[in-house]
């Protein structure tokens, strides 16, 4: 699912919580129903909502990163290389603006209004779509940490 989330979890485990767990790839989400004491899982996307409240502890990676570094975290960034046709970068900016302005319609069109969680609230209150200097500084810190975690994938 998200290599960034896997690496961020590795950073937090090593640098913030100062633990060195063994990592395994989750082969099947059914394993979550048979967790042993001491087991921990990284869940991403809709799976977070599907399993919410089933475990004694849960942590939001971005919130924990902010506690540890006092910086926001950017899980994804839209970028264009230097020299790219300005029409393309303008098109990316237009698509971003359109998406932000039509979030509610997208939630309805894709059936997320029928989910047991507030998809619109999540998309409008939990995600910041502007890449600013603080997020750039945070990404530099993250990249420079050198943390590499294996396995790098979850089922999905």
Model-based region annotation:
Residues 1-33, 37-39, 105, 137-140:
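Bilobed "Venus flytrap"/periplasmic-binding protein-like clamshell domains
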Residues 2-5, 20, 58, 145, ...:
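Generic serine detector
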Residues 1, 11-14, 29, 66-68, ...:
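Short, flexible coil/linker segments at or flanking structured domains
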Residues 7, 61-63, 113:
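Short secondary-structure boundary micro-motifs
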Residues 84-145, 149:
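Secondary-structure end/capping motifs
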Residues 151-156:
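Conserved C-terminal helix/tail region of periplasmic/extracytoplasmic solute-binding proteins
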Residues 25-109:
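Pocket-lining segment of extracytoplasmic ligand-binding domains
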Residues 2-13, 41-44, 74-78, 123, ...:
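Long, contiguous hydrophobic alpha-helical segments, chiefly transmembrane helices and signal peptides
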């Amino acid at each position: 699912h998200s290599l960034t989330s896997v690496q961020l979890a590795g950073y937090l485990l090593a640098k913030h919580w100062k633990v060195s767990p063994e990592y395994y790839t989750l082969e099947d989400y059914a394993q979550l129903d048979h967790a042993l004491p001491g087991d921990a899982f990284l869940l991403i996307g809709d799976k977070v909502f599907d399993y919410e409240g089933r475990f004694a502890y849960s942590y939001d990676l971005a919130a924990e990163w902010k506690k540890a570094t006092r910086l926001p975290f950017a899980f994804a960034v839209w970028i264009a290389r230097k020299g790219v046709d300005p029409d393309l970068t303008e098109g990316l900016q237009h698509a971003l603006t359109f998406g932000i302005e039509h979030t509610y319609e997208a939630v309805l069109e894709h059936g997320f209004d029928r989910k047991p969680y507030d998809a619109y609230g999540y998309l409008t209150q939990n995600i910041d779509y502007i890449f600013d200097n603080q997020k750039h500084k945070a990404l530099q810190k993250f990249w420079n940490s050198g943390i590499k975690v294996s396995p790098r994938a979850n089922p999905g």
